[in-house]
Amino acid sequence: MTTITDEVLDGPHGALPVRTYRSDAPTGHGLVWAHGGGFAAGDLDMPEADGVARGLAEHGITVVSVDYRLAPLAPGAEGVRHPVASEEVGFAFTWATGSGTARGPWAIGGASAGANLAASATLRLLRTGGGLPALVALAYPTLLAVQPEPDAELRAALDADPVADRFGPAVVHAMYANLLGGDPADADAYAAPGLATTEELAGYPPVLMVNSDVDELRVSGELFADTLRRAGTDIEVVREPGTQHGHLNRPEEPAAAVSIGRVAARLLALPVHPLPSSPDEPEHPARAAPAHPA
C-alpha cells in the first residue's frame, strides 16, 4: 500500500505544493519528480506525475512530486517565466533530502519539460555547491531551445508517422519563447541544459536517460548525453522501442511500466544511506495535509 500526503512548502517563489508517495515497505530510496507539459501545462494528477509516482512507490521508493509554477498557457494568461520552475524543483529536492521522508539516496528526475527542470536544477546545485542527487532520471527530455535536425533514420520514422511528428523546430521555438518570455536564441544553460559545456558539467551526477523512440526531442537528449560523456559523467541512455513522445503519460501502453521499472531498478541499485546516529527529527518547513492511503 502507498500513503499519499499533500504538503505546501514555503518555496523560493511562494507556496509550493508537493505530493509525497510512501510505500508501506520503503527501501530508503527517494526521488523528486517533475511532470511534463511544455512548461505551461500538467499537474500532480496526470499519469506522468501520479502514475509514475505510484509505480515507483510499488518498488518501495519514496517519491516527492512537485507542483511547480507554470508558464502562461496562452497569450495574456497568468503564468511565470524562467527560472521560476527550475528553482522550485531544485528547492523541492533540497527540502526532500532533509525532510526525513526517506533515508536516501535521493534522486531527481522528470519527464519532457519536467526532465529539463530536473537537469537544470541539478546544474544549479552543482554550480552553487548544494547537495547533489545520487542519480538524475530524465524521461524523453527537451534540453535545447533551438531544436536540431534529426538524422535521416529518425526523420524517415517521423515522416512515416505524422502523429509522432509534432515537435519540430517551430513548436520547440514557441515553447521556449513562452518559457523565457523572449528569444530562445538567448537561452542560457539553466533554461536549456543541452547548452552546458563539458567544463560546466564537470562533476555532474550519474544520469539515466530514457528516450521515446519516434520523437524528435530525443535529438536534444542525445546531444546532451554526448556532452555528459565527454565531461566524464556516468550516463546510460535507453531508447524505449516503438514509443512516441510522452509514453509515461499513456499508462495503457506497456512501455510506460517498462520505463518506470528501468528507473526503479537503476535507483534501487544504489546503496541505502545508513541510519542517522541522532534521533532528532529534521526540520520540515512545510504545512502538511492529512495523509491518505491509496
Which residues fall in each region the model found?
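Alpha/beta-hydrolase superfamily serine-hydrolase fold, recognizing
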Residues: 3-294
